[in-house]
């Protein structure tokens, strides 16, 4: 790095966090996930050239930002603060699906900015922001090299700390991304479990485990001999196998089965420890010792020739089929196997195949050497142009394989039926059926096949996550009708109870949050609720709730964010009870409410300025005005308008029940 290009100016500068960052647990400003808001003092004269810092971020730290860096050449530091924390979070499996947003203070503090950073974990988001500020400050140092090297040394520890609270695997990240794109609300329940949707239409997921996945079934399929037994007595094809306790027993059973054989852990999935196509007693002994390091339960299985396919089944429907090509390299007629593998591993650090599936690197290990020997090759051999050299016995993607999509119309119907039956007899709502068959275009009844594994929590390619959710939510978005009332009064005679009574009369089990009370139908289930946000979460978790009424009587939602992303009817009265003592004006409340896109807005008579602001936010088709809500015809009309919207939404296909 050339330090002279980094510090172009010795002019004073300021790049500091000011005040206390604010954690929104709910939804604000149109974001589809929690948000960290922080205030930044940014005053820079003649900003330095950041090309070296950019290169360091990408090449030395290996962090790629897919958000746009252009568009604000006058404030390059802000552009990076808008994008780089999100890149760090995504790298650590903290999903961020949209860039941060920046707004500038007007008036007394022209160099102060508010930045809204979307996140999953607020502490992780703040750590990423602080890290980026530290890195950007180095651009102003006369000799930044030493500082950058210190950053690089500490980066591994920083990454581990971020990853500790991140998601495991990649299923969950892309499920949440698909949910956001489909308009399905999500929030984190605990650790790796998320809720999608609300009330009676909500679903829980942990990766591709769902709230409908039976514990018995998932336990059975995790133990391969048990799953194979169930499949066998159901008339489905599986390979003959034996559990073995030592290498001598492994050799004896292999000889009884007849070579070649496969040795694998009986209680692990994902292709871990699998040794395939073993043809000698010596190779079986070595394989047993290797596999026993992964598990004390070792399985010897008859090798079944054929191509390896993963058939994805969700709720009795095949969503997609992949052929799993075993890991290897393709020759170019110039380079050795060793060089080809090194180059491929380097490319796979960030590469994904055309199915957007993360590709895994491969080590040049004993398995690779043995397979090369079987192909009459070694690490120095130069394969011909286009020649495929196999370096892995198992076809699993996790061990370096490559998935290739197979169009459903090319698959014989008998093979589709086979996969559906396998998932059905094992009682699995979501399943990955691994099928070995010579040609999937021909019936397994004619050419033979074997189900080698069933996975109750299968990894999927990105193209399947939206179909997965569409199937789970039956084409809907998991929402229930929501009425939000912004009004100080919260007696039992207020309008929220009137709306609830009418909804109940129509057979809609309606939840209500009003003051400190939470109701599900006619039952008060909580009298010490701290506010509408917490009350709404209670109702969202209750699968009996078919519609929700939130009576906002204080400014808790301004502090925590909205508990829902949508609103069917917004009723705006005199504002929350603490409005007079808060920093929030009626106009700010309207702007805050506009971010949840209410479909119908009913306003009590307001000052002209407030009403004019409402008309600028909500189009004339959405906005209605009622002179008064208490004791007159307008109150009744207001109540029935809200009730009719709720009843109409309840019948809408988008909000039909998920189960």
Predicted features and spans:
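ATP-dependent carboxylate-amine ligase catalytic core
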Residues: 501-595, 599-616, 621-648
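Glycine-rich phosphate-binding P-loop
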Residues: 482-502
